[in-house]
Amino acid sequence: MTVYPTYKDSGIEWLGQIPTHWELTRISSVLTEVKDLNTSLRFSHPSQFKFGDIILKPDVNIEDVSSLSKCIIFRKDDILINGLNLNYDFVTQRIARANYSGIITSAYIAVRVRNNLSSKYVTYLFKALDSRKVFNGLGTGIRLTLTYKELKKYYILLPPQEEQRQIVAYLDYKSNKINERICQRERESYKLYLN
């Protein structure tokens, strides 16, 4: 972990000290809500959340045009948030970054990064916040639902672009190492199973 020469109080109790040259900025100033609906039926196959990824739904009734036209259109690198039923403490992995363009139910939040921000950095940051159940405390209503209207009021930690790139590269590297280990263990288990 990098040690910086000087730190400042973030003003956020759970966050504590941050490097002096990092900023805290309102989410609404760096992320834009994606609201484009699929009214022209440009896309005919909706996507869904699955363990922190966005995948195409396996079973789709493409004749249900009315539901397809109400889906939001997301683009590659948009960030999707499942803000539904936050009061159920499941490990749902509510954050995903789109690897392709497509459509998804408008019940989810889709955001697009503006200048000076890496979508991969925001995804990692939001996944870290999700793992600590930070989003659970932001929901409203009986079923604790998070909306962009509520999300945009909060702040995001914003290091300079080069540091965002370094953070993403480090986390990508570590994630790949973990995935390699998992694959290795699965292969070993499979060999034991066959014997």
Located regions from the model:
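Non-catalytic DNA-recognition/assembly elements of restriction-modification systems
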Residues: 6-38, 153, 161-165, 173-180, ...
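A short glycine-rich beta-alpha junction/loop motif
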Residues: 6-10, 102-107, 140-165
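DNA target-recognition patches
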Residues: 7, 28-65
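Residue-level recognition of short, solvent-exposed, well-ordered loop/turn junctions
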Residues: 23, 57, 63, 69, ...
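A structural connector/turn signal
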Residues: 63, 68-69, 141, 153
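A short beta-sheet element
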Residues: 72-131, 147-148
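Short amphipathic alpha-helical coupling segments at ligand-binding clamshell hinges
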Residues: 121-125, 170, 181
